[in-house]
Structure formats: structure tokens, C-alpha cells
């Protein structure tokens, strides 16, 4: 069974919380499909090239059909010529890939389970830095001692945001923004208990 590490108000180890046993049976392919879809959706479909039907000019036949011994030329807009249209060039393609709700939920479960198995899923009752000082936020992350950390809160208040925003390799999201990709890509996850309960219940 996968276990998340519970931290007390001083961010010290204070026990464990067990994730549902069903999480162990989920296939990693669900996470692969979700990450592939998520990254594809970030692609900007701005690449565009004109075809021979769209470039300007070329209304006149450039040379006689017969007599020169060369190949037949019907238009200067052909992809064969400089200034002509492009054959099979990029169009404004839609890169989005569909992933159904069940696969999204399974991907999230798998990502949480993987972090727990690695000893990198940390649960805290509430994460608030009342002073808004980065020094205190750094002290919190030093207790976790991981290369980079995703912080998931129910609601991020202004002071806590100010404390964490300038720290390298640290990213904060609220519950509605978290997804399987973010959980999987960071080396550790610090999550509020209410959010973890909600995610495991929804998933």
C-alpha cells in the first residue's frame, strides 16, 4: 500500500496516511495518454505556409507549351519555383487530443500513487505563511529536502503566495488547477489534507 507522509504544524514527520489500495492496480499508460494530451494542448497552431493556390502571381503561362525542349510549365506558382507555393506545408493544425474523464481520473490516481511510493507525497493540514516572508517559506521546503516541489492548496492567500513566489523550483496551484502532469513532473508534492481528501474522493 502507498503511504503519504503527514507533517505537523512545524512541518516535521507526524505519521502516515494510506492511499486507497486500488491505486496500485492502475496502469501507467493512463498517465502517458494524459501527459501526451496535456502537452499537445499547449502547442500553438501558428505555423502556416501558402499553397500554390494562395501565393500571388502566376496567372500567365511562363513559356510556350512546346518547342523549347524543356519540361512543360503551367504556372510560376508551382512548388518547383522560387516564390511558388509550398507543397504539403504546415497548416493551422489542431493538436488537441481527447482524453476521457475516466482516463484523467486514473492518471491523477497513478501520479499520486507514484509520488507516495517514492516517499515524495507530503500532507499538511494547512499551509499558510502569515508573515509573507520568503525566509519562512524556504525553511518549510528545507524540511522536505527535495529538488523541486509542487504545492497544492485549497485556496492560496496573498501572504502565502508572496512568500513562495520567488523561490526557484517551487510552484503553487489551487485545487482546481492541479492535474496529473503537474503531480508527475515534480520531484515532490506538498498538499493540504483537505485537497488530498477531495482528489481521492473525486478520483
From Swiss-Prot:
Region (Disordered): 50-74
UniProt keywords, alphabetically: Ribonucleoprotein, Ribosomal protein, RNA-binding, rRNA-binding
A GO CC term assigned to this protein in UniProt: ribonucleoprotein complex
InterPro entries according to UniProt: Ribosomal_uL4, Ribosomal_uL4-like, Ribosomal_uL4_dom_sf
A biological-process GO annotation: translation
Function: One of the primary rRNA binding proteins, this protein initially binds near the 5'-end of the 23S rRNA. It is important during the early stages of 50S assembly. It makes multiple contacts with different domains of the 23S rRNA in the assembled 50S subunit and ribosome. Forms part of the polypeptide exit tunnel.
UniProt name for this protein: Large ribosomal subunit protein uL4
